[in-house]
Amino acid sequence: MHMPSGTQWLIILLIVVLLFGAKKIPELAKGLGKGIKTFKDEMNTEDDKKITQEDAQKIEKINEKDILAKENNEEVKKA
């Protein structure tokens, strides 16, 4: 599919004005903008949570390795 040309955009705009009236269009645009902003914010929040969980798992693995290394080192010293 291709994007509408300039004339097609004008026809679409005219239909929107006829359907909603000139006074409602700024309100609709404002609501649409807020909706898009909220969506983007939620997407960023989900990405942050995912990164945090991944980091926590990496730290947990590193801690397990450190504990095992210390246990092995203590066993070597005792022997």
Swiss-Prot record:
Its main location: membrane. Disulfide bonds: none annotated. It is a single-pass membrane protein. Pfam families: TatA_B_E. Keywords: Cell inner membrane, Cell membrane, Membrane, Protein transport, Translocation, Transmembrane, Transmembrane helix, Transport. One of its GO terms (molecular function) is protein transmembrane transporter activity. GO terms for cellular component: TAT protein transport complex. The keyword Membrane applies. GO terms for biological process: protein transport by the Tat complex. The chain crosses the membrane at residues 1-21. The keyword Phosphoprotein does not apply. It comes from the Bacteria. It is found in: Cell inner membrane. The Tat system comprises two distinct complexes: a TatABC complex, containing multiple copies of TatA, TatB and TatC subunits, and a separate TatA complex, containing only TatA subunits. Substrates initially bind to the TatABC complex, which probably triggers association of the separate TatA complex to form the active translocon. Part of the twin-arginine translocation (Tat) system that transports large folded proteins containing a characteristic twin-arginine motif in their signal peptide across membranes. TatA could form the protein-conducting channel of the Tat system. Belongs to the TatA/E family. NCBIfam families: tatAE. This is Sec-independent protein translocase protein TatA.
